[in-house]
C-alpha cells in the first residue's frame, strides 16, 4: 500500500514537471540595431531603431517562458538592451546596463540575452541602456499568465499597449553629448508621443495619429508604459473611467481614477469599458513637472479611442488634464496603490539604509573655458546619492570585475547614510553641500539580507519627483510622505500588510519614500533615477549581492559571447 502510494506521488510530480516543460517555451528573437529614416513634426532624420521599427517590436511571453534575443549592432554607436523590471534571477549577465552587467555591444558585433520570466505577470518593457539611445530604442514586454491560469479580474475583450515617449528633432545622442560638454542642462524634447506618434495637436502629425478601436460595451486592457526619457507624465482618456489593476507586472487591488501619473520607467495596467456614446475620444498625455523654474516640454500628445461605426471625420472629444505642477493629484493617485492580496513584507531589517537623492553643481575646473561651464552661475550640473556622484567604469563591467576578482574597478564603501545630516528639504541649504564627490562605490549585501532603503529627496539646486528604479529586484513601497523622513513619527504609518510591489518608485518632490526587499538575487544591481539626464549626471549607485549557498543561490557563469570592452 505504501509502495503504491509513494509511486502515485512520484507519478503525480513527474506529470506536473512534464506539463511545466510542455507549457514553458523558449522564444527566439533577433534585434537588428540600425539607422532608419523617421519623419516626425514635418522633418525626417535618421533614428536608431530595432528592426527598422519605432517603437521596436512588442514581445509577448507567458510567465515561465525563456527569452533568447540576439542583438546585432549595425548602428554606429555602442549599445546594450535592458529588460526593464525582469527579475533576472541568477542571470545578471542579461540585465543590460552598460559597464554595470556587461560591456556594450560594439558596432558590427552581436550578443544574445537569455533569461527566464519567473513569477511575473503584466506589463514590462525593454529599452537601450547606453547614452540616450533609448529615446527611440524601446518596446513593450507583455507577460501573460501561465497557460491554464487567468487574470485576477474578468478577461478583457481586447488588449492594447500604449507607450508614452519623447521625440527630439535633433539626434538625442548629440543633445546629451552637447550638454555633457557644456555642463548645462540638455535641450528639452520637441514632442511627446504615443506609440511613436505625436498626435494631431502637432504639425504634420494628424494622418499618423494612433487610433485605438473599440466596440460599445467592450472592456479593453490598456497597458500604459512611460518610456519618456526625462518626463513624468499624466495620462487620461476623455469621458472614461480607468480601473487600475496592475503596475510594474504586479497585480493591485482595483481602484478607479480619471488620471494616471507615470514616472519614466513605470507601467500601469488599466481596464476601460466603452460605456459612452459611440464617438471619438482623445487619449492624452502631458507633463507632470515638479522642479521649479526648470524648462520642460509643455505640449500634449494624443491618440484616439474610436468606437466602431463612428465617422472618422468627427472631431475627438478632448479631456481635461491636471495642471503641469498638480502634485496633489499625483499624491492622491499614488496612495491608492495596494497589492491585490496581503503580502509577506520583511519586518526585521538587516541593512537599514538612508539615501539622499538630488542634484548638485560642480565648480568649474580651472582648465575649463567658460563655454564648458554653462550650468548655474558658471558651474556644471551634477547629481548624486548620499553625496556620491556615480561614475561608470570603462575597461570592465562591474559584474565582470566582481566575478573575476579584478581589483581597482570599484570599491564597496558606498555610505549607508549621507555624510552630513542637514535639513534636506529646507530652503537654505549650505552651498558646501552642492558639490558631491565622484566615485564608483557599491554597497555590499549578504545573500538573504532584509533591506530597507529610505529615499529622501533634497532641495539642493531644486527638489523634484525622482523615479528611482532598482535593477534585478521588485520591492515593496511601505511608505511615502513630504518633508524630511522622521523614523520616530513616520515608521508607525508604514503599510506592512498590502503595500504595492514595484520596480520603480516615484519619490515625491520635497519628500521621501521607503522601500523594502530581500537580497535574494546575487550579482551587481544598479539603482538609479530614471530621468536619463540625472543618471548621466551621476544620480545612481549599485548593490553588490553576494552568492548564497548552492547552485540556486549563485550567479550563473558568464555567457561565451559576452562583449568585451
UniProtKB/Swiss-Prot annotation:
Entry's cofactor comment: Binds 4 Cu cations per monomer.
GO biological process annotation, one example: lignin catabolic process
GO cellular component, one term: apoplast
EC numbers on record: 1.10.3.2
Presence of keyword Zinc: no
Chain residues that bind Cu cation 1: 82, 469
Keywords: Apoplast, Copper, Glycoprotein, Lignin degradation, Metal-binding, Oxidoreductase, Repeat, Secreted, Signal
Binding residues annotated for Cu cation 2, in chain numbering: 84, 127, 530
Entry binding sites for Cu cation 4: 466, 529, 534
Residue positions with a glycan: 78, 187, 203, 298, 325, 377, 387, 395, 428
Limits of the Plastocyanin-like domain: 32-148, 158-310, 413-549
Protein origin, superkingdom: Eukaryota
Cofactor: Cu cation
NCBIfam families for the chain: laccase
The family this protein is said to belong to: Belongs to the multicopper oxidase family.
Name under which the protein is recorded: Laccase-12
Organism annotation: Arabidopsis thaliana (Mouse-ear cress)
Species lineage: Eukaryota, Viridiplantae, Streptophyta, Embryophyta, Tracheophyta
Gene name of the record: LAC12
